[in-house]
Amino acid sequence: MARKVLASGLAESLLLLGRIEFFDLRLPDSADTTFVRALQAAGEADDNLLGAAILAHSAFVPGWAGHLDGARERMHAARTYARRAPVSADVLAWLDAVEAECLTRCGDHRGALALLRHAEDVLAADSDILPPDWFTWFSTTRLHAFRGNTELRAGLIPQARTTLEQTLSELPQTDGKQRIVVLGDLASVEAAARRPEQACALLEQALDQLAITWYATGMERVREARRALTPWQDTAAVRRVDDRLYSWSTTLSSLQR
């Protein structure tokens, strides 16, 4: 029993480390290795639900690299592990959201949106099963953030704006990392709508938050939005963003991490 408790604690710690490596630092290879170690510890603990969470996180690695088959295989494994344990609606919806993000990154926007609608239905249904204590990274608001990004990448600009503005209004001020991501996506929405000044205002808000809380995934979204502003790169608003995006501190943070 003591061995299982220790193994469970180790698996949770390694999962957190893998999340930091993948999302905060954008070190996918290191994260992939850490997720394997986390899965080994979850196996020692015989914790199927923790194993499902680790496998789903590991699906981000091939999914974000555009390798759909690898992501699907890992998601199938994650869902198989989840079926072996009592599972809450929150966890089931999150599994849908993870797979949807992988599909989005691989260009299957229709499939991703279908999964996100299913996740919303799952969350809306009653469930007596509570999520485990370590499951702290997902909520209805986070699901909306997933959907807004998919709508953006699918070219559904009005829908993406509505979804992301709602998400931003619901996010607590303390959730700085997610706010950076949503602000970056909203800036991309405004750039796609040919509203460069509004996009720049959102990017400046994102850069304000990045100065407080560095988040490599958030910086990626900021850079994506800035690339979308290339047609207006000689305007004063875009140059102000560039002056901040390529300040000494921001440039050094990007290179060091």
Residue ranges and their predicted role:
Residues 1-257:
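Conserved binding/catalytic microenvironments
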